[in-house]
Amino acid sequence: DHLDYHGNLASYEKAKKRILMAKQKISYETDPYKLFEWITESKPKKIKFNNLPYRYEIISSNVVNDSKSTNYHSLSHALKKAKHSFKKSKYSLIVCGDPKKEGYRNIKVDGPEKIYMFGSYAKNINKCIEHPKKIIVNSLDDALNQIYENTRPNNILFSPGYPSGNDFKNYSERGKYFNLKLGKYLSKWK
């Protein structure tokens, strides 16, 4: 304990105040990697953090899986990020899920060239989203096929914008399903 070492509170305070007296800077360096190298005389290993699965996960240079997007706010955030991810080029948005859990909120979507809607709630989503080019498809396969056949470049943002509803158990299952279906198209797009 500190008081055992210093004997009493006055000695403890005196020792701590001495730290402030020695405030001459020995380095103006603030980069933690350079400081580590300076102190340990070895180079630190750079740590790379990967995105968590299905949270704006970059699958390839032209595909983003944001299955975790389960509400208006996360969809809006993904749309803002997509402008930079796709370097301001055209992209398609794929949405699905149950808009009831978002209160059938009307959403004006800016950014994507086309919006593809699939699943048992596609017609309800169609009523909620304002965009000039909305396309209801029967399945995720149909959406991916239409994007592959009719859209160049094949940039895709999968950001459902709604909770899974009855179509999927949760966002994780939905994200895995997207990656599985996407697999057969990725080799064609390269």
What residue ranges belong to the model's regions?
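Flexible active-site lid/hinge loop adjacent to a nucleotide/diphosphate
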Residues: 1-28, 164-172
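Nucleotide phosphate-binding/pyrophosphate-handling subdomain across enzymes
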Residues: 31-114
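Short glycine-/acidic-enriched loop or helix-start segments at secondary-structure transitions
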Residues: 5, 74-75, 103-105, 126-128, ...
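Short glycine-rich anion-binding loops that position phosphate/pyrophosphate groups of nucleotides
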Residues: 1, 70, 98-100, 121, ...
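C-terminal helical cap/extension that packs against the catalytic core
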Residues: 99-155, 190
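Charged helix-capping and loop-helix junction motifs
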Residues: 11-13, 105-111, 171-178
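Residue-level signal for inorganic ion chemistry
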Residues: 12, 66, 93, 115, ...
